[in-house]
UniProtKB/Swiss-Prot annotation:
<dbReference type="GO" id="GO:0030165">
    <property type="term" value="F:PDZ domain binding"/>
</dbReference>
<dbReference type="GO" id="GO:0030425">
    <property type="term" value="C:dendrite"/>
</dbReference>
<comment type="subunit">
    <text>Component of the minor spliceosome, which splices U12-type introns.</text>
</comment>
<dbReference type="GO" id="GO:0005681">
    <property type="term" value="C:spliceosomal complex"/>
</dbReference>
<dbReference type="GO" id="GO:0031122">
    <property type="term" value="P:cytoplasmic microtubule organization"/>
</dbReference>
<dbReference type="GO" id="GO:0008380">
    <property type="term" value="P:RNA splicing"/>
</dbReference>
<keyword id="KW-0507">mRNA processing</keyword>
<dbReference type="GO" id="GO:0006397">
    <property type="term" value="P:mRNA processing"/>
</dbReference>
<keyword id="KW-0508">mRNA splicing</keyword>
<dbReference type="Pfam" id="PF10235">
    <property type="entry name" value="Cript"/>
</dbReference>
<keyword id="KW-0963">Cytoplasm</keyword>
<protein>
    <recommendedName>
        <fullName>Cysteine-rich PDZ-binding protein</fullName>
    </recommendedName>
</protein>
<dbReference type="InterPro" id="IPR019367">
    <property type="entry name" value="PDZ-binding_CRIPT"/>
</dbReference>
<comment type="function">
    <text>As a component of the minor spliceosome, involved in the splicing of U12-type introns in pre-mRNAs.</text>
</comment>
<keyword id="KW-0747">Spliceosome</keyword>
<dbReference type="GO" id="GO:0008017">
    <property type="term" value="F:microtubule binding"/>
</dbReference>
<comment type="similarity">
    <text>Belongs to the CRIPT family.</text>
</comment>
């Protein structure tokens, strides 16, 4: 669960956009080049487990968080009804019986 403000911080997928005017993968806007493999050319986006961008641990259950920039795992964020990135209350869970299985 991610709030509207943190949804902008999420990463983008490697696949190109479908063609439309103003798309970010067109060559005239300085975007993606033709015949370029983004998976091979983007070394900065590649995950390095020993580097500075390693994944954090959940503040509640201390398990590994598999989303860069998040402080809570998806299970704990769902159970508590909070945003996984900032911890803001997203869902009122007073009358719910939440389980993460």
């Amino acid at each position: 669960m991610v709030c509207d403000k943190c949804e902008k911080k999420l990463g983008t997928v490697i696949t190109p956009d479908t063609w439309k005017s103003g798309a970010r993968n067109t060559t005239e806007s300085g975007g993606r080049k033709l015949n370029e493999n983004k998976a091979l050319t983007s070394k900065t986006a590649r995950f390095n487990p020993y580097g500075k961008n390693k994944f954090a641990i959940c503040r509640i259950c201390k398990s590994s968080v598999h989303q860069p920039g998040s402080h809570y795992c998806q299970g704990c964020a769902y159970k508590k009804g909070i945003c996984a990135m900032c911890g803001k209350k997203v869902l009122e869970t007073k009358n719910y019986k939440q389980t993460s299985v």
